[in-house]
Amino acid sequence: MARPKNVKHIFVTGGVISSLGKGILSASLGMLLKSRGLRVAIQKYDPYINVDPGTMSPYQHGEVYVTDDGAETDLDLGHYERFLDEPTSQASNLTMGRVYKSVIDKERRGEYLGGTVQVVPHVIDEIKEKMNDLAKNGSLDVLITEIGGTIGDIESLPFLEAMRQLKLELGDRNVLNIHLTFVPYIKAASELKTKPTQHSVKMLLETGIQPDILVCRSEKPLSREIKNKVGHFCNVHEQDVIGLNDCETIYAVPLMLLREQLDLRVMKKLGLKKFREPNLEHWKRFCEKVTNPKDGEITIGVCGKYTEYPDAYKSIIEAFIHAGASNDVKVSVKMLRAEDAEDSSFNMNKAFEGVSGLLVAPGFGDRGIEGKVQFVQYARENNIPFFGICLGMQCASIEFARNVCDLPDANSTEFNKRARFPVIDLMEQQKKVKEKGGTMRLGSYPCILKEGSKVHEVYGKFLINERHRHRYEFNNQFRKLFEEKGMIFSGTSPNGELVEIIELKEHRWFVAVQFHPELKSRVQKVHPLFDGFVQAAKEFAMGKRQLTLEDELPRLSSEEMEGAG
């Protein structure tokens, strides 16, 4: 198989409306090209002026996805990693804020030799230089770049201009544009409407870019007639109009695009030849397990502060899909708003109806903390499988200190700087940090597991590496007391100073971690902790069903019992 001499660039843009799924499209195409033997990477360009999403509200941006090298990035990078099973990095996410910051820093250093710094050429040249960063080391065949925003947005124009110039410089055989649009279905007319797509392409043409391939999102499949009409009015061949209708799971998208031959159209246009046929049997089996689990459904409660906006917990939800497939069940997530438990009229028994496990999610700030602590207490006292992540571990520590160690005023100094029993405290190296952005303990760090612990059993090894995003840690002054009361510190930093994992031996599953395991769960590599947690929740659910069944069976009299013998 002959490698291309130059890295091939694929740019994915979106039109008509936002949230069409450019990230899923990019990840799916990347997976298809990788399955053919090509070396693929994906990057995301966001048009906002923030340097990174690290300080942005989860309500506005969703979760912050942390890479191994400590970059705080867009949640779409999570899709890239889950679909490609390849790590991303700081270079995989560029914001317009970082571009402007770099240009201004260069101006301050005098690198522009007294010239007037302008969007064209200086900002555009900076973007083009960044576009090639991932391609410089010679380890790639294809680089896919997702351009955030919607065609027509002012913010995206510099990215589009850089893309236009790059295509002019490198040629059609090296740069390709895929434009994702929306074809709405009008129920009153019982037909799909192509006019929004036509207008979106018209706006893209106004920037000097002719799309090479159109991918049309729709509620229903596109007929050949519709594809022909779209192609005719948008100046692309009918075979370059790809249908992408709604499906049960996002993991079915690569299979749909394979049937539509998107990967073949891309390879032909970029002159990529003699690559192997894709083998996606493993992916098909996974999708079958997701859509038709043989052991039914279980419900897991996710207690958080941002439950109105599920994208704030995107990687957690996806990790449950992976773990559900691994355990032959569908995991239905029930969002539990932490603040609700702080109301005196709140019924905890009702909140846990039908729930077979509790995950207390990450977050920042004191809002809803007391509610989270109450949820942890209920799960611990009722032997319900429990899993805490980051802030969830800190809440589990506070709850254990108050209700088991008899430290009623236990708290974190994040919520009460004068806490009498600060079982969670600011990390020593964080105490002189003043700025918010990019200053936490970020990225991948090693952790040593305790032999014989639950986590050692599920990981099957002693040394692990997990991704972190936190400023506060367990206060070691309380370790001895916790251990005396039954808490196991089953994971620590290699020097033993930083507590990474806690668990309870006598509980069916009570594990809490300081890191973010959801960020490393993959389709073919379900994260061991999610796998173990879902398995415990499944066993708990089956036990409850068995008890319910026994209660519903008619009770036989002693005479009937003797007769049955």
UniProtKB/Swiss-Prot annotation:
<dbReference type="InterPro" id="IPR027417">
    <property type="entry name" value="P-loop_NTPase"/>
</dbReference>
<keyword id="KW-0067">ATP-binding</keyword>
<dbReference type="GO" id="GO:0019856">
    <property type="term" value="P:pyrimidine nucleobase biosynthetic process"/>
</dbReference>
<feature type="binding site">
    <location>
        <position position="229"/>
    </location>
    <ligand>
        <name>CTP</name>
    </ligand>
</feature>
<dbReference type="GO" id="GO:0004359">
    <property type="term" value="F:glutaminase activity"/>
</dbReference>
<comment type="similarity">
    <text>Belongs to the CTP synthase family.</text>
</comment>
<feature type="binding site">
    <location>
        <position position="76"/>
    </location>
    <ligand>
        <name>Mg(2+)</name>
    </ligand>
</feature>
<feature type="binding site">
    <location>
        <position position="363"/>
    </location>
    <ligand>
        <name>L-glutamine</name>
    </ligand>
</feature>
<keyword id="KW-0479">Metal-binding</keyword>
<dbReference type="GO" id="GO:0005829">
    <property type="term" value="C:cytosol"/>
</dbReference>
<dbReference type="InterPro" id="IPR017926">
    <property type="entry name" value="GATASE"/>
</dbReference>
<feature type="binding site">
    <location>
        <position position="471"/>
    </location>
    <ligand>
        <name>L-glutamine</name>
    </ligand>
</feature>
<dbReference type="InterPro" id="IPR004468">
    <property type="entry name" value="CTP_synthase"/>
</dbReference>
<feature type="binding site">
    <location>
        <position position="229"/>
    </location>
    <ligand>
        <name>UTP</name>
    </ligand>
</feature>
<feature type="binding site">
    <location>
        <begin position="153"/>
        <end position="155"/>
    </location>
    <ligand>
        <name>CTP</name>
    </ligand>
</feature>
<dbReference type="GO" id="GO:0003883">
    <property type="term" value="F:CTP synthase activity"/>
</dbReference>
<protein>
    <recommendedName>
        <fullName>CTP synthase</fullName>
        <ecNumber>6.3.4.2</ecNumber>
    </recommendedName>
</protein>
<dbReference type="GO" id="GO:0042802">
    <property type="term" value="F:identical protein binding"/>
</dbReference>
<feature type="binding site">
    <location>
        <position position="18"/>
    </location>
    <ligand>
        <name>CTP</name>
    </ligand>
</feature>
<feature type="active site" description="Nucleophile; for glutamine hydrolysis">
    <location>
        <position position="390"/>
    </location>
</feature>
<feature type="domain" description="Glutamine amidotransferase type-1">
    <location>
        <begin position="299"/>
        <end position="543"/>
    </location>
</feature>
<comment type="subunit">
    <text>Homotetramer.</text>
</comment>
<dbReference type="GO" id="GO:0046872">
    <property type="term" value="F:metal ion binding"/>
</dbReference>
<keyword id="KW-0315">Glutamine amidotransferase</keyword>
<dbReference type="InterPro" id="IPR033828">
    <property type="entry name" value="GATase1_CTP_Synthase"/>
</dbReference>
<comment type="pathway">
    <text>Pyrimidine metabolism; CTP biosynthesis via de novo pathway; CTP from UDP: step 2/2.</text>
</comment>
<keyword id="KW-0547">Nucleotide-binding</keyword>
<feature type="binding site">
    <location>
        <begin position="193"/>
        <end position="198"/>
    </location>
    <ligand>
        <name>CTP</name>
    </ligand>
</feature>
<feature type="active site">
    <location>
        <position position="518"/>
    </location>
</feature>
<keyword id="KW-0460">Magnesium</keyword>
<dbReference type="GO" id="GO:0005524">
    <property type="term" value="F:ATP binding"/>
</dbReference>
<feature type="binding site">
    <location>
        <begin position="391"/>
        <end position="394"/>
    </location>
    <ligand>
        <name>L-glutamine</name>
    </ligand>
</feature>
<feature type="binding site">
    <location>
        <position position="59"/>
    </location>
    <ligand>
        <name>L-glutamine</name>
    </ligand>
</feature>
<keyword id="KW-0436">Ligase</keyword>
<feature type="binding site">
    <location>
        <position position="414"/>
    </location>
    <ligand>
        <name>L-glutamine</name>
    </ligand>
</feature>
<feature type="binding site">
    <location>
        <position position="76"/>
    </location>
    <ligand>
        <name>ATP</name>
    </ligand>
</feature>
<dbReference type="GO" id="GO:0044210">
    <property type="term" value="P:'de novo' CTP biosynthetic process"/>
</dbReference>
<keyword id="KW-0665">Pyrimidine biosynthesis</keyword>
<feature type="region of interest" description="Amidoligase domain">
    <location>
        <begin position="1"/>
        <end position="272"/>
    </location>
</feature>
<dbReference type="InterPro" id="IPR029062">
    <property type="entry name" value="Class_I_gatase-like"/>
</dbReference>
<dbReference type="Pfam" id="PF00117">
    <property type="entry name" value="GATase"/>
</dbReference>
<dbReference type="InterPro" id="IPR017456">
    <property type="entry name" value="CTP_synthase_N"/>
</dbReference>
